[in-house]
Amino acid sequence: MQMITLAQQAKIASVELAQFGNVQKNQALLTIAQQLEQRSAEILAANAKDIEFAKNQGISTAIIDRLLLNESRLQGIANDVRNVAKLADPVGQVIDGGVLNSGLKIERQRVPLGVILTIYEARPNVTIDVASLCLKTGNAVILRGGKETKFTNAVLVEVVQQALETAGLPKLAVQAVTDPDRVLLLELLKLDRYIDMVIPRGGAGLHQFCKENSTIPVIVGGIGVCHMFVEKSADQQKALELIANAKTQRPSTCNTLETLLVEKAIAGEFLPKLANRMKALDVTLHTDDLQKTEGIEPLDDARMRQEWLSLDLNVVVIDNLTKAVEHIREYGSQHSEAILTSDYQLARQFVAQVDAAAVYINASTRFTDGGEFGLGAEVAVSTQKLHARGPMGLEALTTYKWVCEGDYLVRK
């Protein structure tokens, strides 16, 4: 199928879908969740094919972890869809309004964006997360997954389209591009007449490619070079457990800790404790502030600007909070940054000075997630400042229109 035909179909479907209410949309969502559970064996078998292909291609373990589905992860995806169904539908909500001096009654109402193009790599969960959020908000979506998710996505898209049909909604509100040819992606990125927003979910290269080639607005985000600053007043034992969570719970995610900043005043005491704790968790430290032994490697400036997505952690000794903020400005990706401290004033200073979508005081960066923020599933974590920032839930997939009413009112 030509990309322009696919985009035109999506546009027509978005107009149709926008006319349906919450009841039918929720019916489709609940059917999706049910079918994910009932067809789990089929979905996991397809995923096993994708995993085998990825291993044969020499794809990294971090990417394979993102690609992997198991019973637990699939159940989690189904639960997320049910949670989306429980959320209030933002479409039609009146944001604000009133009656002006002219007598004009005016309201600002939430409406769907229209057609969303989502481009992602080895993340089959994105297929369902994005489809469910777009469905809930009355948006059509074009899903362009990577070649690594070919078999899994085929089954997942079939599940979604069948649920749409069962609920009496337009099947083509969710479509997939199955050919990984980048020429086709380039065509899609020029179809601003039909597509309203592009959301890339992948590495820095994918984001840069979309920014450079798209005539459609692009949401930039998902690159998480996340920092944590251990200030001298921090509870060191609690800090070690929090660092372990932020680094090791799921290393391949964008909200995982990548660089730890330790205040110089406590470095001599804290770093040996850190080294022991991380060694027990098979985490390799990259630092110039500890003697090079097993599990400790030299610090690499270039790697401090990138995600590890693995059990590797940069460790840098910093003079004070001001220097920590300067380091984050230089190396951070404006995703999630944290401070561990018992000093409330320093915590507020850190929050005020750090430029990031999410800033934490004595909490793990792993909380930067739509579900954890109470948004349901998310389409992305935006690190830009226009339209949306941080985890993008339902409201981020809407825009608004001004609805104005008068009694044959004319402007004087």
Swiss-Prot record:
Signal peptide: none annotated. GO terms for molecular function: glutamate-5-semialdehyde dehydrogenase activity; NADP binding. InterPro entries: Ald_DH/histidinol_DH, Ald_DH_C, Ald_DH_N, Aldehyde_DH_dom, Glu-5-SA_DH, GPR_dom. Keywords: Amino-acid biosynthesis, Cytoplasm, NADP, Oxidoreductase, Proline biosynthesis. It catalyses: L-glutamate 5-semialdehyde + phosphate + NADP(+) = L-glutamyl 5-phosphate + NADPH + H(+). The keyword Cytoplasm applies. It is found in: Cytoplasm. Gene3D superfamilies: Aldehyde Dehydrogenase, Chain A, domain 1 (3.40.605.10), Aldehyde Dehydrogenase, Chain A, domain 2 (3.40.309.10). One of its GO terms (biological process) is L-proline biosynthetic process. Pathway: Amino-acid biosynthesis; L-proline biosynthesis; L-glutamate 5-semialdehyde from L-glutamate: step 2/2. CDD domains: ALDH_F18-19_ProA-GPR. The keyword Iron does not apply. GO terms for cellular component: cytoplasm. Its EC number is 1.2.1.41. It is an enzyme of class 1 (oxidoreductase). Belongs to the gamma-glutamyl phosphate reductase family. Catalyzes the NADPH-dependent reduction of L-glutamate 5-phosphate into L-glutamate 5-semialdehyde and phosphate. The product spontaneously undergoes cyclization to form 1-pyrroline-5-carboxylate. NCBIfam families: PRK00197.1, proA. This is Gamma-glutamyl phosphate reductase.
